[in-house]
Amino acid sequence: MTTDD
């Protein structure tokens, strides 16, 4: 899982 803000 990847999270980009």
Swiss-Prot record:
Enzyme class: transferase
One Gene Ontology molecular-function label: adenosylmethionine-8-amino-7-oxononanoate transaminase activity
Catalytic activity: (8S)-8-amino-7-oxononanoate + S-adenosyl-L-methionine = S-adenosyl-4-methylsulfanyl-2-oxobutanoate + (7R,8S)-7,8-diammoniononanoate
Cofactors that this protein relies on: pyridoxal 5'-phosphate
Domain of life: Bacteria
Pathway(s) the chain acts in: Cofactor biosynthesis; biotin biosynthesis; 7,8-diaminononanoate from 8-amino-7-oxononanoate (SAM route): step 1/1
BP term (GO), one: biotin biosynthetic process
Keywords assigned by UniProt, alphabetized: Aminotransferase, Biotin biosynthesis, Cytoplasm, Pyridoxal phosphate, S-adenosyl-L-methionine, Transferase
Subcellular location field: Cytoplasm
GO cellular component: a single term: cytoplasm
EC number: 2.6.1.62
Family: Belongs to the class-III pyridoxal-phosphate-dependent aminotransferase family. BioA subfamily.
Function in brief: Catalyzes the transfer of the alpha-amino group from S-adenosyl-L-methionine (SAM) to 7-keto-8-aminopelargonic acid (KAPA) to form 7,8-diaminopelargonic acid (DAPA). It is the only aminotransferase known to utilize SAM as an amino donor.
Binding partners and assembly: Homodimer.
Protein name (Swiss-Prot/TrEMBL): Adenosylmethionine-8-amino-7-oxononanoate aminotransferase
Species name: Citrobacter freundii
Gene encoding the protein: bioA
